[in-house]
Swiss-Prot record:
Main location, first listed in the record: cytoplasm
EC number(s) stated in the UniProt entry for this protein: 2.7.2.8
Pathway: Amino-acid biosynthesis; L-arginine biosynthesis; N(2)-acetyl-L-ornithine from L-glutamate: step 2/4
UniProt organism field: Novosphingobium aromaticivorans (strain ATCC 700278 / DSM 12444 / CCUG 56034 / CIP 105152 / NBRC 16084 / F199)
Protein name per its UniProtKB record: Acetylglutamate kinase
Amino acid sequence: MSQNHDPAMLAKAETLTEALPYLQRYAGKTFVVKYGGHAMGDPELAQDFAEDIVLLKAVGINPVVVHGGGPQIGRMLKALGIESRFVDGLRVTDKQTAEVAEMVLAGAINKELVSWIARAGGKAIGISGKDGGMVIARKVEAKKAPKAVADAESGDPIVVDLGFVGEPDRIDTTVIDTICKAGMIPVIAPIGVGEDGETYNINADTMAGSIAAALGAARLFLLTDVPGVLDKDKNLLTDLRPADIARLAEDGTISGGMIPKLETCVHAVEAGCEATVVLDGRVPHAMLLEIFTARGAGTLIRA
């Protein structure tokens, strides 16, 4: 028997043994992962993400991927000479813009991600919320534009119809369950269909949160471009409850785009998801560190 104990090899063995209780805990569970941000535009990070998803499937976890694509939609609209407008972070979406969004999300991005997973040795099925009537959407109510955009006479904020922007109203998980049971990985574009038969563009975080709740997922992961939720001194907050989030929003610790993300997390855990995690998608294999190590790698939100 060899007596050469390579420290690096021993460290790898210790990592595997540390993962054992988590492998046992999560076997057969469902994880919903919202994939977006910087990681989508970096081939190395995209490869790392695909490998992580395939590994989860290989160890008996059912990953369900929901992806975004706002920057890609913006680039395509610019190339086509179509102006982009936003209200409260939501894209004003007319019929033409909705068609472009569906083309980019359900076409280019979705199939590219399926290909990354295939290259990593997995089998993925690319779908959108329209397939099988999975996501029935309702139109998002008109929004008040920022105060800078006001009626010239009254000075009141102008109410803007966002067009074909929706949010999940009902979710049928049959298609997702069928794909998972077949040993494959669902990759879902955030597009839904309304009762009126119209196509609606849905915020990817919102879509992922609603799907996680409908599935009763063990985890919802939101991959972002920040380490997680930070306090005022920029230290990572590793464990939060809904009451903590309300307090942090009230005192200004969290603001901007982080607020709707955390609202999604709170809704998900209150509607059936066991826990949610906000973590840095720019860090290679951050999701594996969060799942399989005691220290974790992001901010965990529980009810």
